[in-house]
UniProtKB/Swiss-Prot annotation:
Recorded domain comment: The IMP cyclohydrolase activity resides in the N-terminal region.
Protein name: Bifunctional purine biosynthesis protein PurH
Top-level lineage group: Bacteria
Record carries keyword Transport: no
GO terms for MF: IMP cyclohydrolase activity; phosphoribosylaminoimidazolecarboxamide formyltransferase activity
Organism listed in the record: Ligilactobacillus salivarius (strain UCC118)
SUPFAM superfamilies cross-referenced by the UniProt entry: Cytidine deaminase-like, Methylglyoxal synthase-like
InterPro entries: AICAR_Tfase_dup_dom_sf (IPR024051), Cytidine_deaminase-like (IPR016193), MGS-like_dom (IPR011607), MGS-like_dom_sf (IPR036914), PurH-like (IPR002695)
CDD domains given in the database record: IMPCH
Keyword Transferase included in the entry's annotation: yes
Length: 512
């Protein structure tokens, strides 16, 4: 007779699986609640204490850390000396292990969790058994996922045993499982210890789906989510309509979400290739849409739209007239959803953008052979902290417009220039190797919309005074930029020459 050790918290489909094991001549060893559950289901089980000849001690901290368990798991069946040792020590081999780990992740997801409670939910015996079983995969089947039950049942029925290929795959899966578990623990404890830059960085992500392709059709791609995702992450969006999100869709949607969360009032962000092409703000979301569309009615075609208010029918009917890839909003009125869903391919995503008191986590960027890690670019964008550096100071209304433009330029690829008025962006110059070209592009896009309310924002300092001169000659009345150039005085002098008000934020917003 073969022996299986079963100790799980996830009881889904457990009884049929264990009954199948019994049907194939397994005796069942179990612990605590799992044993009681199986006994009540009419399945005969053996307690772990009967196997170890030792009681559970230290409030359950020591149950399975015992040679009768690990000897039965680690003994290599093809080695006579191993099997002789088992016989001498009266240890029965264990042929299958099915174990869930303590719910550490669920524990630390509770904002009220204490360090003591978190530590008590660090599993020791479970990972030890899983690792022992996975190491000895040639002789032991190891199961960590209820989704694998059905396939194992089928294989037992068809072949009477689990193949070496399956055992090896389950072993690899188990080591991924325990590594991810330990990574969460390491990350949590490192944060509790105030370790911002640990010498070993452990990250864990869960596969959401395989993708049709990546950035281009010849590239394979997969979509993973952080094991502890943010509530407002694209990974948490609920898809209400449309085709499956593509690799590029997800990156664009992420950029749109980051941008729209900057704004408190009703705002619409239109985005293409991770750059905003139009941002509109108003007292209501319909008018904000009108302004975002007006900002660049050409580039918005095939774009991603993020709205930070519920989508009503009037707004939906206007958006329905265009070809759009994605619309993201916190809510959709029923009639608005009905209208937009008429386009079967239009991806509609529902996601709460509310600014919650979540921890601001670091973000990573992949490079060849490594990664870069940095704090997120989040800062209180408060004009009260800005410095007026010119003879003319911006008016209160200009300051509000400068703040709007400053938030917009923050989410535009460097070198970035945004021209805006108090209602919308007028022109966006993104991703140019030099700042004067970005300035010219932004002002060209603004065109006839330039008026005495137009302001300009630059994500980094002006290396020379040419951008200020060009902006002033085209009617810009106020400028916001970080400052910090060795030639700041030249830019200030040029602004004074044309009577342009200019403020320094002291903060740069490069975006690569």
């Amino acid at each position: 007779m073969k022996r299986a050790l079963v100790s799980v918290s996830d009881k889904n489909n457990l009884v049929p699986f264990v009954k199948k094991l019994v049907e194939h001549d397994f005796e069942i060893v179990s612990t605590g609640g799992t044993k009681k559950y199986l006994d009540e289901a009419g399945i005969k089980t053996i307690s772990v204490e009967e196997v170890t000849h030792f009681p559970e001690i230290l409030d359950g901290r020591v149950k399975t850390l015992n040679p009768y368990i690990h000897g039965g798991l680690l003994a290599r069946r093809e080695l006579p000396e191993h099997m002789e040792t088992l016989k001498e020590q009266n240890i029965t081999p264990i042929d299958l292990v099915c174990v869930n780990l303590y719910p550490f992740k669920q524990t630390i997801e509770n904002p009220e969790v204490t360090l003591e409670n978190a530590i008590e939910n660090i599993d020791i015996g479970g990972p030890s058994m899983l690792r022992s079983a996975a190491k000895n995969y040639r002789d032991v089947v190891v199961v960590v996922d209820a989704d694998d039950y059905e396939g194992l049942e089928k294989e037992l029925d068809e072949n009477g045993e689990i193949s070496l290929e399956t055992r090896f795959k389950l072993s690899a899966k188990t080591f991924r499982h325990t590594a991810a578990y330990d990574a969460l623990i390491a990350d949590y404890l490192s944060k509790q210890a105030g370790e911002d830059n640990p010498e070993k960085l452990t990250l864990t992500y869960d596969l959401i789906s395989s993708m049709r392709y990546g950035e281009n059709s010849h590239q394979k791609a997969w979509f993973y989510e952080d094991a502890m995702p943010k509530a407002y992450s694209i990974t948490q969006a609920k898809q209400l309509n449309g085709k499956k999100l593509s690799f590029n869709n997800i990156r664009d949607a992420d950029a749109a979400i980051r941008a729209v969360r900057e704004f408190d009032g009703p705002t619409v962000v239109a985005l293409k290739h991770m750059n905003p092409c139009g941002i509109g703000q108003a007292d209501n979301i319909e008018l904000a849409w009108d302004r975002a569309y007006e900002a660049d009615s050409i580039s918005i075609f095939g774009g991603v739209i993020a709205l930070n208010r519920k989508v009503d029918l009037a707004t939906a009917e206007k958006m329905h007239k265009l070809f759009l890839e994605i619309i993201i909003a916190p809510e959709f009125d029923a009639d608005a959803l009905e209208v937009l869903s008429k386009k079967k391919n239009l991806r509609l995503l529902q996601l709460d953008f509310t600014k919650k008191d979540e921890d601001v986590r670091d973000e990573t960027v992949s490079i060849m052979g490594g990664l870069l890690r940095q704090e997120q670019d989040v800062i209180d964008e408060n004009p009260k902290n800005w410095e007026v550096v010119t003879e003319n100071a911006p008016s209160d209304s200009q300051l509000e417009t400068l703040l709007f433009a400053w938030k917009a330029v923050k989410h535009t690829k460097s070198n970035a220039i945004v021209v805006a008025n108090d209602e919308r962006t007028l022109g966006i110059g993104a991703g140019q190797p030099n700042r004067i070209d970005s300035t010219k592009i932004a002002i060209k896009h603004a065109g006839d919309s330039l008026n005495d309310k137009a302001v300009l924002a630059s994500d980094a300092f002006f290396p020379m005074d040419d951008c200020v001169q060009y902006a002033a000659e085209h009617g810009i009345k106020a400028i916001v930029q970080p400052g910090g150039s060795i030639r700041d005085k030249d830019s200030i002098a040029m602004a004074n020459k044309y009577g342009v008000a200019m403020v320094f934020t002291g903060v740069r917003h490069f975006r690569h």
